Amino acid sequence: MRRRITFVQRPESPFHVDQAVLTSDALSITHLDAAREERATFGFDELPAEIWQVLKSSHELHIRWATERPYEIGAPFSSRISPGLHVYYTPGTARETGVGLCSLLKTVFDESLECQSLRYYSRLPSLQNLVAFIQHKFCDRSDEKCVHHAESILSADSVDVNYDSISHALTVSGYWSTSPGQGWTEQIRKHAADTHQVEVGLLGVESATEPEELKMEPTLFSFPSRHHPLPADATYTVSFPAPTGLHPTLTISMPRASLRRPPAPPDATCALHTYLTLPSWIFGDKYQLSTTDRLFLSSHNLAALRAVAGETDLEAPDWVVSRWGSNWLLELATPLRPDTSPEEWNASIPLHLRYLTPSESGYRSAAVPWPIVFWACTAEDGTKMGVNPFDRVNLGWEGLFGARTMFYQLHPAPAEGKDRLVEELDVPVLRLREDAGFFQSKTIELGTVVVVGLGLLWVLWKLGLVLWIAGTGRSTRAQKRTDKHRKAE
């Protein structure tokens, strides 16, 4: 196993050499105020059988998880995804259906996962099951340090799992945007058997003091990044104006600072985008959102629908939808002069709810994860991307842009009193309670039977009337022919 631990201090964070003491077999960290990324890489021979048996039949597997809590991002960890569990799977052969992976995901994360598709999303507020799985499969019962280390995942802001058939290695990464309490304090020791490699990086901003540091010298290496953070005042807020009903409108509100062009090269073309992750019970109308009607687009401050994937059936109720939901990439319209625009710029996206199973109250609570909002800018010609070791890839949305595109992330800012990047909606459904008023299930069932019965009687009566009229007509004509024959005789 290989471990890579990276601490990144903010420019305003204090640092003294006594906070990092290196010896021949350990590195001691004391009260270090920094963001942290920890990455562990495993070979096949270090994994439990149920994991490597699934991986050996896979071509690629990428799992992304983000907390529902608001958290900060900073260079070089500057990318975001919507809260929840995201899975992107490429089987090794065309015959592989992903059944084994789905069973493994249920064991590792949650038994309630419905992961029939190769691309999947689920709201997963906690990684408690993952922690228990790691403690059971990777830690000895007497190894308290390993157990405690696994528990630290519960406070992580994001977790990534990656595998590809070329490297035959499973990589697990965790990110903590802030340090706990008074800072990171721990002793990172060398492995006793000297079989595990540990790399530790301490990154920060320091003022140059030595003469050789003051003199400018050309660098021999660089790390161009695709993801960049914007200033702290570049924020956005998500809401669903009441009443939501069955056709809620997702509103993204942004201050003027979010509408200013990001610090991209002058010749770059930039556009503001949002990427929505919608569970199966809520969806957009791709025919409505892909319209070129300028009046509709301008009324919602939208520019265009750029991509959609997943379930887009407009009529199916939720209980017959087999796929997890859908993803939507939309370009947002921005004012020509942001500094003279309204204090708050709102972009609205009309959505629709599917029929959910009945409940006793007549409502069901459902959660919508916040979308991410970002600027996408084309990079300069000749800029090589993808060499930054801290850049996250396979996020689900960055692959929809060209390889030379740079992203500038806006910061989600929940309203006062909210502490989650999730919106809860009360979805109206059929009531099951017998005292729920006139429109209750039994009344509707009885009314349906009565209406269908009356309709059937009306149809039978009409058919009988037609047959009676036809029979009467034939009898009359026959009688007339008989009378004519008698007169002729």
UniProtKB/Swiss-Prot annotation:
Any matching Pfam family: PIG-X
Keyword terms of this UniProt record: Endoplasmic reticulum, Glycoprotein, GPI-anchor biosynthesis, Membrane, Transmembrane, Transmembrane helix
Recorded family membership: Belongs to the PIGX family.
Subcellular location: Endoplasmic reticulum membrane
GO biological process, alphabetically ordered: GPI anchor biosynthetic process
Topological type in the membrane: Single-pass type III membrane protein
GO cellular component: endoplasmic reticulum membrane; glycosylphosphatidylinositol-mannosyltransferase I complex
Coiled-coil region(s): none
Glycan attachment points: N346
Entry-linked InterPro entries: Pbn1, PIG-X/PBN1
Gene: pbn1
Topological domain ranges for the Cytoplasmic compartment: 470-489
Chief place of localization: endoplasmic reticulum
Lineage, top ranks: Eukaryota, Fungi, Dikarya, Ascomycota, Pezizomycotina
Membrane-spanning parts: 449-469
Task of the protein: Required for proper folding and/or the stability of a subset of proteins in the endoplasmic reticulum. Component of glycosylphosphatidylinositol-mannosyltransferase 1 which transfers the first of the 4 mannoses in the GPI-anchor precursors during GPI-anchor biosynthesis. Probably acts by stabilizing the mannosyltransferase gpi14.
Lumenal face of the membrane: 1-448
Pathway(s) of this molecule: Glycolipid biosynthesis; glycosylphosphatidylinositol-anchor biosynthesis
Protein name: Protein pbn1
